[in-house]
Amino acid sequence: DAGFVLARLRDLPTDDEALGPVMDLEQVGIAGHSRGGKTVGRACSTNPDYRACAVLDNIGPARERMTGIDQPFLTLRSAWDDARVAELHDYLGRTGSVAHDVVLENSNHFSCTDIPLFVAEVRLDGVDPASGIESCASILEAFFATFLTNKIAVATNWLPTGEVANVMIRRFQARAGD
């Protein structure tokens, strides 16, 4: 589980020459696709060591939908029906920090993964499978670079404009009273 992995990383020697310069365990983010997105929701609700959380094409578990998440939160998804979008926005509206709903147009459930590179049945006509991966990677990189470096106060325009086409974004503020 995600907590086990983070605990094992903390067990590594801090003077390790290979990992020391690239691994800052005070600024850990977590991302997950589909069922892994539910894992992200649970991990973030139970472990404040995750400083930013990203879910690809899913909504968090039922318990977290009622309470929200306290860390900066990103949902990166394909187009959904109105009822599912309303459910997501209700969840994101319960955030204790900031939350973003980013819709990658001309995408499907698998567009942020490498599956369309290998499985023709999930490819979208006229859409290069690599472009979905590149767009998602750019968005995730910008999100984590911003929200893991304590730039929350200036993080209204963190999305990499010009690098990612066909994106819609909606921002949610912290819960009232926070």
Identify the function of each model-found stretch:
Residues 1-25:
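Alpha/beta-hydrolase active-site loop
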Residues 2, 28, 101, 144:
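Divalent metal-coordination and catalytic microenvironments
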Residues 7-14, 45, 145-149:
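Sec-exported extracytoplasmic/periplasmic mature domains
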Residues 17, 27-29, 52-54:
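Residue in the alpha/beta-hydrolase core beta-strand immediately N-terminal to the catalytic nucleophile
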Residues 31-36, 40:
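Gly/Ala-rich beta-loop-alpha elbow adjacent to hydrolase catalytic centers
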Residues 42-51:
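Conserved hydrolase catalytic core segment
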Residues 51-112:
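The feature captures the conserved acid-bearing segment of alpha/beta-hydrolase catalytic domains
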Residues 106-108, 115-178:
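Alpha/beta-hydrolase-fold serine-hydrolase catalytic core, especially in secreted/extracellular enzymes
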